[in-house]
A protein has these predicted regions:
Chain B
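Transmembrane alpha-helices and adjacent helix-loop boundaries
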Residues: 2-308
Length: 248, 308
């Protein structure tokens, strides 16, 4: 563990009421790394992800992002979220805005760009995710895969230093998953730092620098994909991967 | 898609032409009503360029004579002449009703939006908003008007800057009363609509760094206010009708004028029948207008799940 880790999560614990959902979770990432959180549903991986941009509040532990304590009560959370992009399982596109409107809202209202600049940036980002021909479509007029790509463009338009993906393909029909993964592959190639919660094991295997396996709110095992997938040290990891594989 | 190419049955064609005849009649009646109102107002405003102020736009005697010549309508000729004679008063009353309703509705909306927002997203302020809403909805509107007019004597506090806008200061008291009361009802409709905006919309707004207030302004309100239009139209329609309560604090709006005419002439049935038609015209206009507004601001997919 070096001092210049880009993201360092240390002993993060979280309770919902009486129930503890995260138990001393720790992991770290360098700039440009891709870390994939895997685990059964209810294992706390989405909650962990949301603690990083404070959509969920961890009660204990420390999350250092670029040297700054994310969990500090003095932190300006809006400032933090400006720099950390997030992509949701359910897309959560603004239903009253077109694709361009969705992507331009942050640059316009949060970053303070002019109307024209914000629109230009939105168009560039939509082009980046392959939606140059759907600029003025409303979310309801787009397929799930297209909506999720708008969601990615919306996060990218803020020029984040870290991207969080919360099961970005789980709500998609199988034939639409590919187009979203393709965009994500592209981001990996560009060197984006990404923390990803997903069940797409082939994606995880192909791009992850490290896999973190969570079960019951605890880190069971973590390591590079070849190690975790080929020679898991923990029995639970092996069982989980077998179960997942049999569904593929 | 077979049904789209199937020739319409006779019954369907009759129904279709009935509908278009109905629509035509409605448009004609609307044009007549608003034309009469507008011309009357312009005539009065310009000091009687068309006919002397206080005179009907068409001479009652002429109407009476014309109708008397038509066999089926001859029996109603005298009544029609009487009604035409009363139209200047009715036009003034109707105009005031329109103004009071429009101004109160707009001012009420300005108060209702923050009320609804604090009710849904506030903490302490949610209780203040709830208390306001319950107090204003839970007491009779007429009693509220009496408190403002007789109790607090607010008519004597109307600022000089606006006291000349209407012939009498009491009109402002009525507008204040309807604004405060209507805001409570409007807030209830808007609150319901805001609550139906999905939680994920707010999460997404916060996730790109918008503050809570900015998220409400840029994300929740544009959606929620669109959802609110159909139920909010109810408040519009109610306000047109309960603006007649202003008559009880001596505001010379439509009901007040009708009541005065009736008291002087004892033609209660006829006058209130005609007055009823005036209110009906206003209400129909309001609901048609709001349907137009709803269509105008509609966004594909937004609110579709609510129509199921």
């Amino acid at each position: 563990m070096s001092d210049d880790d880009f993201l360092r999560v240390t002993d993060v614990s979280k309770w919902y009421g009486e129930e503890q959902v995260l138990h001393d979770v720790s992991f770290e990432m360098d700039r440009g790394d891709v870390t994939v959180l895997i685990g059964p549903s209810g294992s706390g991986k989405s909650t962990m992800l949301r603690c990083v941009n404070r959509l969920a509040e961890a009660q204990e532990g420390s999350i250092l992002l670029d040297g700054e304590e994310v969990l500090s009560p003095d932190l300006d959370v809006d400032e933090l979220r400006r720099e950390v992009g997030m992509v949701f399982q359910g897309f959560n596109l603004f239903a009253h805005l077109t694709a361009v409107g969705n992507v331009a809202l942050g640059p316009r209202r949060v970053l303070g760009l002019s109307e024209t600049e914000a629109r230009e940036r939105a168009e560039d980002q939509l082009e980046r995710v392959g939606l140059a021909d759907q600029l003025d479509s409303y979310p309801a007029e787009l397929s799930g895969g297209q909506q999720q790509r708008v969601g990615i463009a919306r996060a990218l338009a803020m020029e984040p230093k870290l991207m969080l993906f919360d099961e970005p393909t789980s709500a998609l029909d199988p034939e639409l998953i590919g187009e979203v993964l393709e965009v994500m592959h592209g981001l990996v190639d560009e060197g984006m730092t990404m923390l990803v919660v997903t069940h797409e094991m082939s994606f995880a295997r192909a791009v992850a620098d490290e896999i973190v396996f969570l079960d019951d709110g605890r880190v069971v095992e973590r390591g590079p994909p070849e190690q975790l997938f080929e020679r898991p040290e923990e029995e639970r990891t092996g069982r989980f991967l077998e179960r997942i594989a049999s569904h593929d | 898609m077979a049904s789209a190419t199937r020739p319409a049955t006779v019954r369907e064609r009759v129904a279709e032409s009935d509908r278009s005849v109905g629509r035509l009649l409605l448009v004609a009646a609307g044009a007549l009503f608003w034309g009469w109102l507008a011309v009357s107002w312009v005539n009065r405003w310009l000091g009687g360029v068309l006919v002397p102020v206080g005179q009907p736009l068409v001479p009652p005697a002429a109407v009476e004579a014309t109708l008397a010549g038509i066999p089926v309508l001859a029996a109603y000729a005298a009544d029609a002449g009487f009604v035409v004679e009363m139209t200047p008063d009715l036009a003034r009353g109707t105009w005031l009703t329109v103004v009071i309703t429009g101004v109160s509705l707009a001012l009420g909306f300005v108060i209702a939006v923050p009320l609804a927002v604090t009710r849904v997203y506030g903490r302490f302020s949610a209780w203040v908003s709830l208390a306001y809403t319950e107090l204003l909805r839970g007491t009779p509107l007429l009693a509220q008007l009496f408190v403002l007019y007789y109790g607090l004597n607010l008519a004597s506090y109307v600022p000089d800057a606006v006291s000349g806008v209407f012939a009498r200061e009491v009109v402002w008291v009525a507008i204040l009363g309807f604004t405060l009361n209507g805001a409570a009802y409007q807030a209830e409709y808007i609150r319901g609509a805001l609550e139906s905006v999905e939680e994920g919309q707010i999460t997404a707004g916060r996730a790109i760094g918008l503050s809570k207030l900015e998220t409400i302004y840029h994300v929740v309100l544009p959606q929620g206010l669109r959802y609110a239009i159909p139920s909010w139209t109810n408040e519009f329609v109610y306000l047109i009708k309960y603006s007649s309560l202003a008559g009880f604090i001596t505001v010379p709006e439509l009901y007040y004028r009708a009541d005065q005419i009736a008291a002087e002439t004892f033609r209660y049935t006829l006058i209130f029948l005609v007055t009823g038609v005036m209110y009906l015209a206003l209400v129909l206009t309001a609901s048609k207008l709001m349907v137009r507004v709803e269509e105008r601001v509609a966004i594909p997919g937004l609110g579709a799940e609510r129509e199921e």
